[in-house]
Amino acid sequence: MIELRCPWCRTVNRIPETRTGSPARCGRCSQPLATTLAPVSVTDATFDAIVTRASAPVLLDCWADWCGPCHALAPTIDDIARAHAGRLVVAKLDVDANPETASRFGVRSIPTLLLFKDGQLVDRLVGAQPRGAIEARLHPLITGVTAP
């Protein structure tokens, strides 16, 4: 079972791992829960609802369509989303279409990966990073245990 905290009412919901990727709703308030196996698209308008209210840590991939390294990193981001479904919200922000959020967090180069916990920015990685480097930064956020 995967435990997901509802971002709306803060109730902890237990979801069978077999239902990961399927639509799920909070048992208390009936709002949708993020159980997706793919990154979620974030806009300036939806940033606070998706990232700030997330019940799990968030990996936000800031990218642009014209960026070659962003496209090279995309399969890694997709793999991380599948591997950590239910424990991590993976989101993507097109910086050209959503300059307000990119500016708010000082995104000057892409790709930039922003890591959030409890709605607060806690870490960032700039440039195309290997999966191992990304996982090393995610590990303490997901497990609550810092690496030695």
Which residues does each predicted region cover?
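Short cysteine-rich clusters marking metal-coordination/redox-active sites
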Residues: 6-9, 26-29
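Non-catalytic, surface beta->alpha helical segment in thiol-disulfide oxidoreductase systems
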Residues: 109, 114-147
